[in-house]
Curated annotation (Swiss-Prot):
The gene is hypA. The keyword Zinc applies. Involved in the maturation of [NiFe] hydrogenases. Required for nickel insertion into the metal center of the hydrogenase. GO terms for biological process: protein maturation; protein modification process. InterPro entries: Hydgase_Ni_incorp_HypA/HybF_CS, HypA/HybF. It comes from Psychromonas ingrahamii (strain DSM 17664 / CCUG 51855 / 37). Zn(2+) binds at residues 73, 76, 89, 92. This is Hydrogenase maturation factor HypA. NCBIfam families: hypA (TIGR00100). It comes from the Bacteria. One of its GO terms (molecular function) is nickel cation binding. Pfam families: HypA (PF01155).
Amino acid sequence: MHELSIAESIIELLEEHAVTHKFKKVTKIILEIGVLAGIEKSALFFCFDVAAQNSLAEGAELLIEDKLAQGVCQNCHLQVTTTGWYEPCPYCGQLLINITEGEQMKIKSLEVEN
């Protein structure tokens, strides 16, 4: 379950930002996760609650926004949006899409208290 290590990394990032930006508590976190990131959202919610115990993020609301994948078709060279690895190009039908975006995860926004 790599979601636990992801949740722990999020807490570490929050603690680093708390020192830099001088806040004491996180009340809300919005993550943006690519649909191809391989992260199980329900597991991440559970693991985040566990990792946040006794931290500045304990009790924080965690929201996750999906980010669609983007790619470029190697056949027709058009940029396409996709939700899976092996979907055909909507323009030419070929299965030759190079994924350029959609595997990442980022903290999109935070709500904090001083």
